[in-house]
């Protein structure tokens, strides 16, 4: 492992979050300007990340061993769940504001705590359960304007709330699969085979109706894949230089970026309930990270292999 350099790890983490957030903004733009469906977005996001990942492995001299796997079906399960989560998150971007989708996405690490107890038999005690409760309360606050039952409620925003929450649950379940895979598999293999699987699954949605993109939309779609691959490399590198418990909280920089991009690019001013709810979710997430550090639970390899979307 490289010499520990916490500042470099933090900077790499912030860079990865920034690139992932810009990538998500590009995806949202293709939804708003060209009505590109989520399956098509997943295909381009995944396909054009693969060359970036392969070049990175080749430069590190790991192309031969980096893709080797002893758990092919594990990658399939993780790929299917992660692809569904990514598609739901991309769909949510078409239905809700950028800050709303970002805030709801923070439910994923909270749900991981619950899923780890359910599926991995992990011992989860009062403190972390309390933080999960606080965080999910924050998520409900963010969701509350969309879940009103009045006659004037916007059905598309209601659908967006459900879709975004489904994406967060899918991302959490994908993290459970990754947590099992990292016990035997290299991070590079997990990242590559997820991109490969999601490319195939994204392509399978072609019969359900894709759009023919104009030049600008095509550049945004291709760019989202390239940026997605670059962000994954930055994320993986961040955890090589600093402990997960130090680096992971900087995930929440994405909220500031989402607010700025939503405001300046999409004309979306964050509602007060979003800011209040997001604050509770972020507080709970940071406290869970702190508690896992106290308990000596190592999450670096799992976090290296995950993306913000699934």
Segment roles from a protein language model:
Residues 1-14, 113-165, 169, 282-310:
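Juxtamembrane helix-loop boundary signature in multi-pass membrane transporters
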Residues 9-15, 69-79, 124-137, 157-160, ...:
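Cytoplasmic-side transmembrane-helix entry/capping segments in multi-pass membrane proteins
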Residues 9-16, 63-88, 158-167, 212-230:
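Loop-to-transmembrane-helix transition segments
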Residues 17-25, 54, 79-87, 109-114, ...:
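Hydrophobic/small/kink-forming positions within alpha-helical transmembrane segments
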Residues 21, 25, 53, 149-210, ...:
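Transmembrane alpha-helical segments that form core, pore/gating elements
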Residues 34-84, 169-174, 193-208:
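Transmembrane alpha-helices of multi-pass small-molecule transport proteins
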Residues 44, 102-107, 181-197, 232-264:
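Helix-helix packing/entry segments at the starts of transmembrane helices
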Residues 89-91, 108-133, 256-275:
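C-terminal transmembrane-helix exit sites in multi-pass transporters
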């Amino acid at each position: 492992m490289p010499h520990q350099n916490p500042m470099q790890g933090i900077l790499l983490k912030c860079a990865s979050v920034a690139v992932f957030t810009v990538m998500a903004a590009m995806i949202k733009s293709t939804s708003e300007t060209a009505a590109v469906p989520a399956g098509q977005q997943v295909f381009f996001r995944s396909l054009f990340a693969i060359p970036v990942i392969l070049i990175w492995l080749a430069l590190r001299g790991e192309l031969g061993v980096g893709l080797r796997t002893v758990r092919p079906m594990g990658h399939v399960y993780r790929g299917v769940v992660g692809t569904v989560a990514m598609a739901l998150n991309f769909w949510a971007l078409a239905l809700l504001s950028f800050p709303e989708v970002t805030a709801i996405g923070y439910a994923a690490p909270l749900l991981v705590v619950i899923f780890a107890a359910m599926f991995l038999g992990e011992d989860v005690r009062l403190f972390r359960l309390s933080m999960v409760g606080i965080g999910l309360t924050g998520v409900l606050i963010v969701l509350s304007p969309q879940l009103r039952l009045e006659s004037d409620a916007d059905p598309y925003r209601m659908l967006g709330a459900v879709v975004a929450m489904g994406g967060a649950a899918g991302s959490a379940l994908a993290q459970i699969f990754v947590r099992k895979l990292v016990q035997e598999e290299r991070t590079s293999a997990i990242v590559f085979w997820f991109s490969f699987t999601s490319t195939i699954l994204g392509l399978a949605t072609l019969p359900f109706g894709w759009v023919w993109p104009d030049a600008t939309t095509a550049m945004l779609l291709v760019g989202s894949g390239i940026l997605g691959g670059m962000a994954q490399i930055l994320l993986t590198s961040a955890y090589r230089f600093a402990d997960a418990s130090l680096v992971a909280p900087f995930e929440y920089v994405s909220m500031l970026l989402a607010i700025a991009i939503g405001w300046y690019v999409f004309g979306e001013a964050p509602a007060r309930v979003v800011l209040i709810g997001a604050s509770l979710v972020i507080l709970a997430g940071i406290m869970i990270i702190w508690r896992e550090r106290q308990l000596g639970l190592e999450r670096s390899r799992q976090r290296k292999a995950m993306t913000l979307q699934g």
